[in-house]
Amino acid sequence: MSKKALCIISGGMDSTLCAYLAKKEGYEIIALHFDYEQRTQEKEKECFKQICKALKVEKSYILDVSFIKDIGGNALTDKSIDIPKNELCISDIPPITYVPFRNGIFLSIAGSLAEKENCESIFIGVVEEDGSGYPDCTDEFIQKAQEFINEGTSKNFKVCIKTPLVRLNKAKIVELALKENVPLELTWSCYESEDEACGECDSCLLRLRGFEKAGFKDKIKYKS
């Protein structure tokens, strides 16, 4: 029986690279995507499906967690709140694009699915550099989440949450992704647009800076 990993794939660079690294480690990948009615959900879902096809994933899940939008309080799900432009968050205070406890919600559900599918690992693409001010993107939080899942599941099930990118910056992530032949042109990072990336939101700026510092050109289309 092959070892299995549940890979949480948003459609972005980091989670996609994590899935490729899981495959390199010899895991059979079960892919998981969450629809929480964020602004770019349709584009992210399209990217997820293309990434699964590129990885030859045989089993995938797209789960509706739209109650996250009902909770609100963030610019990703509430279109009445403007997405900040041309400024990178460097504060310890969560930015308005922070979705409260999102990774906690995702990992709780992933833990349930991992137990059902008998996965020995969960891969999630959290990056501390990206998560400045995001309390659920730290290595400490992930370790606590792993303890929580293992405490709350059956005694004969133990899962390891793997975060291979947590200490890397965006340039290193781009370099590693290209080294591993990850099709970054299939990924999406923009918080606001689904046709052409805005090039101005926090996520676009981090992505563009990563490509620039790594010395490579991003192949996706940008408005600016």
UniProtKB/Swiss-Prot annotation:
The protein's name in its UniProt record: 7-cyano-7-deazaguanine synthase
Residues that bind ATP: 9-19
GO biological processes: queuosine biosynthetic process
UniProt KW keywords: ATP-binding, Ligase, Metal-binding, Nucleotide-binding, Queuosine biosynthesis, Zinc
Reactions it catalyzes: 7-carboxy-7-deazaguanine + NH4(+) + ATP = 7-cyano-7-deazaguanine + ADP + phosphate + H2O + H(+)
Cofactor remark: Binds 1 zinc ion per subunit.
Organism per entry: Campylobacter jejuni subsp. doylei (strain ATCC BAA-1458 / RM4099 / 269.97)
Its EC number(s): 6.3.4.20
GO molecular function: ATP binding; ligase activity, forming carbon-nitrogen bonds; zinc ion binding
The keyword tRNA-binding is assigned to this record: no
Residues engaged in binding Zn(2+): 190, 198, 201, 204
Family: Belongs to the QueC family.
Pathway given in the UniProt record: Purine metabolism; 7-cyano-7-deazaguanine biosynthesis
Pfam family for this entry, one: QueC
Names of the cofactor(s): Zn(2+)
Function field: Catalyzes the ATP-dependent conversion of 7-carboxy-7-deazaguanine (CDG) to 7-cyano-7-deazaguanine (preQ(0)).
Disulfide-linked positions: none
